[in-house]
Amino acid sequence: FPIDDDDKIVGGYTNR
């Protein structure tokens, strides 16, 4: 699951 939600809206965990 996204900790640092960079692209969590689109479903891509960029930061984490």
UniProtKB/Swiss-Prot annotation:
Main location (coarse class): secreted
Source organism per UniProt: Felis catus (Cat)
Tagged with keyword Calcium: yes
Protein name: Trypsin
Keyword set, alphabetical order: Calcium, Digestion, Hydrolase, Protease, Secreted, Serine protease, Zymogen
Family the entry assigns: Belongs to the peptidase S1 family.
Cofactor(s) essential for the protein: Ca(2+)
UniProt EC number: 3.4.21.4
Domain of life: Eukaryota
Note describing how the cofactor binds: Binds 1 Ca(2+) ion per subunit.
Subcellular location: Secreted, Extracellular space
Propeptide: 1-8
UniProt GO MF annotations: serine-type endopeptidase activity
GO cellular component: extracellular region
Gene Ontology process terms (BP): digestion; proteolysis
Reactions listed under catalytic activity: Preferential cleavage: Arg-|-Xaa, Lys-|-Xaa
